[in-house]
Regions:
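Extended alpha-helical interface modules used as scaffolds for assembling large macromolecular complexes
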Residues: 1-131, 137-139, 149, 167-168
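Domain-level recognition of nuclease-like catalytic cores that cleave nucleotide substrates
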Residues: 128, 143-168
Length: 168
């Protein structure tokens, strides 16, 4: 990916896009995840970032860049322990958001990502199924089962469009 991405209050992408992220937006994302187990606002913000990238940014684009965008946003959600590719019995869930205080009934989130280039769009359902199977396997692991109120999602990006499915 060309250029630098900085996710602290103000975001600069390719020196052209100037996205302001209000503290209240993070608060809304946090509430939605912690209290409802939903990721709609998180996905919406990530979608904005993807749409602001240039076509050149997508030349050698991969799944890890989608995950990185979500990871950088989630770093600001301070009530969660954020885990990326946490090894669990030789399996690696892409992102886990685990509530730091598990006595408050906050929801946890597990996300599995996949990426397709625009010309591979016809493989969307296949990738969604692959991601769903993976996340269902992860959900059966003891360390994952121990996370209370866990909501699981798959996100397949086709170039700059995100397709989200809830798995439980």
């Amino acid at each position: 990916m060309h250029g630098m991405i900085i996710f602290i209050g103000k975001v600069k992408l390719n020196k052209n896009a100037d996205l302001q992220i209000a503290e209240s937006e993070y608060t809304e994302i946090l509430k939605e995840i912690a209290l409802e187990g939903k990721i709609d606002k998180l996905v919406s913000l990530a979608q904005k970032y993807l749409e602001s990238l240039s076509n050149r940014d997508y030349v050698k684009f991969e799944e890890k860049y989608i995950k990185l965008i979500f990871y950088c946003i989630a770093m600001n959600l301070k009530i969660f322990r954020l885990k990326s590719e946490m090894e669990v019995q030789r399996k690696y869930p892409d992102i886990l958001l685990i509530p730091k205080n598990q006595t408050k009934g906050y929801r946890g989130i597990m996300i599995e990502f996949k990426y397709l280039k625009k010309e591979q769009a016809e493989k969307l359902q296949e990738k969604q199924e692959e991601a769903r199977k993976q996340i269902e396997e992860y959900a059966e692991l003891e360390e994952i089962k121990d996370i209370p109120n866990l909501n699981c999602y798959t996100i397949v990006a086709v170039n700059d469009k995100l397709y989200v499915q809830k798995c439980n």
